[in-house]
C-alpha cells in the first residue's frame, strides 16, 4: 500500500495563534488559565492544554474573580464580550481568528447601517453564535441559512437592503449553491468584498480533492466537532471514495484498508502534525510503504499573538 499526503493539511495561522496565546498565557501568568469554549476543536490539543493548566468553560460565570480569561478561536458575541469585561478579571485575551473577526466586522457594519444581514453557516456552531451576536439593530434583522431550501423559505423585511456573509469553515461547493440561491431570490443582495471562507479551508478542500483523485480511501485527521475537518471527509465521500474522520491513529480499523492500494491522509486545520505522523506510523505497521507528499499551495500566513504575550515558550510536545 502507498501513502499519499495532502498538501496543505493541518494547522492554519488562526489555530496556531490561538494555541500560542493559551500556551504563552500559562507560561507568563501560571495556571490556571480559563478559556471560553475549546480554544480549537481538536481533542488532542485541548487535552494537552488541560494538562498544562488550561481550564475550558462555557459560561463566563464559571470564571473566578481575578482570573485570566481567553476567548477561543471561534469568537464570541457582543453580549459575551460585555459580560467578560464587566467581571473583575486580571487579564482578558482574545484568540478569535482574525479572519473570523473580519466577518464580525462585516456584521457589525451592517447593523450600524440598518441593513439586514444573512449569515450562511451551521446552526449551533460557536463561530456562528459569535457572528450572529455581532448584530444589534432592532430595526434590521439577522438571519441564518444553511441550504438553498432555507433561502427559498426566508422572509426578510426589505429585499432591497440586504447583505450576506459566511462562516469561515464551510464547504466551498455547498456555499456556492447557497449564494446562487441568495442572488436569485434577492437580486439586490450584496456580498462581502472578499470571500469569507478562509484561505485554509479553501486550500485544504482543494488539496483533499486532488488527493481523492488518486487514493482508494482517505483518512481525515480531525475531531468530530471540527467543522472544517467534517467538510473534508464529506467532500471525499461525494467524490465516491470512502473517507474516515479520525481523532488519532488508534481509530484506524484494519478492514478499512482491505483491497486499498493507495491510502490518502489529510488533516483538518485544527489537527497537529504529530497526529498525522502517528497515523503514518500506524499505516506502516499495517503494511503500508513510505509516504509521498503531493504538491500543493504554499501557505506562509502568520497571525501575531497580542503584544503582551510575545515571549518564547515551548510548544506542545
UniProtKB/Swiss-Prot annotation:
It holds the Pfam family LYTB. Binds 1 [4Fe-4S] cluster per subunit. Pathway: Isoprenoid biosynthesis; dimethylallyl diphosphate biosynthesis; dimethylallyl diphosphate from (2E)-4-hydroxy-3-methylbutenyl diphosphate: step 1/1; Isoprenoid biosynthesis; isopentenyl diphosphate biosynthesis via DXP pathway; isopentenyl diphosphate from 1-deoxy-D-xylulose 5-phosphate: step 6/6. Its EC number is 1.17.7.4. Its cofactor is [4Fe-4S] cluster. GO terms for biological process: dimethylallyl diphosphate biosynthetic process; isopentenyl diphosphate biosynthetic process, methylerythritol 4-phosphate pathway; terpenoid biosynthetic process. It catalyses: isopentenyl diphosphate + 2 oxidized [2Fe-2S]-[ferredoxin] + H2O = (2E)-4-hydroxy-3-methylbut-2-enyl diphosphate + 2 reduced [2Fe-2S]-[ferredoxin] + 2 H(+); dimethylallyl diphosphate + 2 oxidized [2Fe-2S]-[ferredoxin] + H2O = (2E)-4-hydroxy-3-methylbut-2-enyl diphosphate + 2 reduced [2Fe-2S]-[ferredoxin] + 2 H(+). It comes from the Bacteria. Isopentenyl diphosphate binds at residues 41, 74, 125, 226-228, 270. The active site is at 127 (proton donor). The keyword Protein biosynthesis does not apply. [4Fe-4S] cluster binds at residues 12, 97, 198. It is an enzyme of class 1 (oxidoreductase). Dimethylallyl diphosphate binds at residues 41, 74, 125, 226-228, 270. Keywords: 4Fe-4S, Iron, Iron-sulfur, Isoprene biosynthesis, Metal-binding, Oxidoreductase. (2E)-4-hydroxy-3-methylbut-2-enyl diphosphate binds at residues 41, 74, 125, 168, 226-228, 270. GO terms for cellular component: cytosol. One of its GO terms (molecular function) is 4-hydroxy-3-methylbut-2-enyl diphosphate reductase activity. Catalyzes the conversion of 1-hydroxy-2-methyl-2-(E)-butenyl 4-diphosphate (HMBPP) into a mixture of isopentenyl diphosphate (IPP) and dimethylallyl diphosphate (DMAPP). Acts in the terminal step of the DOXP/MEP pathway for isoprenoid precursor biosynthesis. Homodimer. Belongs to the IspH family. This is 4-hydroxy-3-methylbut-2-enyl diphosphate reductase.
Amino acid at each position: 500500500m502507498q501513502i499519499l499526503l495532502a498538501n496543505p493539511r493541518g494547522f492554519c495561522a488562526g489555530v496556531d495563534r490561538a494555541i500560542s496565546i493559551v500556551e504563552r498565557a500559562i507560561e507568563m501568568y501560571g495556571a490556571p488559565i480559563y478559556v471560553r469554549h475549546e480554544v480549537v476543536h481538536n481533542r488532542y490539543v485541548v487535552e494537552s492544554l488541560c494538562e498544562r493548566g488550561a481550564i475550558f468553560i462555557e459560561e463566563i460565570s464559571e470564571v473566578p474573580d481575578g482570573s485570566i480569561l481567553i476567548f477561543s478561536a471561534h469568537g464570541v458575541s457582543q453580549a459575551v464580550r460585555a459580560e467578560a469585561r464587566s467581571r473583575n478579571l486580571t487579564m482578558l485575551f482574545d484568540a478569535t481568528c482574525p479572519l473570523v473577526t473580519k466577518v464580525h466586522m462585516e456584521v457589525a457594519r451592517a447593523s450600524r447601517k440598518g441593513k439586514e444581514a444573512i449569515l450562511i453557516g451551521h446552526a449551533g456552531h460557536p463561530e456562528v453564535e459569535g457572528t450572529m451576536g455581532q448584530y444589534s439593530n432592532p430595526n434590521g434583522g439577522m438571519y441564518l441559512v444553511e441550504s438553498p431550501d432555507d433561502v427559498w423559505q426566508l422572509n426578510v423585511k426589505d429585499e432591497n437592503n440586504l447583505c450576506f456573509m459566511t462562516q469561515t469553515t464551510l464547504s466551498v461547493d455547498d456555499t456556492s449553491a447557497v449564494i446562487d440561491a441568495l442572488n436569485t431570490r434577492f437580486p439586490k443582495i450584496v456580498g462581502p468584498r472578499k470571500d469569507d471562507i478562509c484561505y485554509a479551508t479553501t486550500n485544504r478542500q482543494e488539496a483533499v480533492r486532488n488527493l481523492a483523485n488518486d487514493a482508494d480511501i482517505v483518512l481525515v485527521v480531525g475531531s468530530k466537532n471540527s467543522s472544517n475537518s467534517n467538510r473534508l471527509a464529506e467532500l471525499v465521500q461525494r467524490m465516491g471514495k470512502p473517507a474516515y474522520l479520525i481523532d488519532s491513529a488508534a481509530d484506524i480499523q484494519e478492514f478499512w484498508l482491505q483491497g486499498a492500494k493507495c491510502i490518502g491522509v489529510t488533516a483538518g486545520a485544527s489537527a497537529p502534525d504529530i497526529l498525522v505522523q502517528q497515523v503514518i506510523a500506524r499505516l506502516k505497521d499495517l503494511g503500508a510503504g513510505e509516504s509521498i507528499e503531493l504538491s500543493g499551495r504554499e501557505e506562509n500566513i502568520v497571525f501575531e499573538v497580542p503584544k503582551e504575550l510575545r515571549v518564547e515558550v515551548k510548544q506542545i510536545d
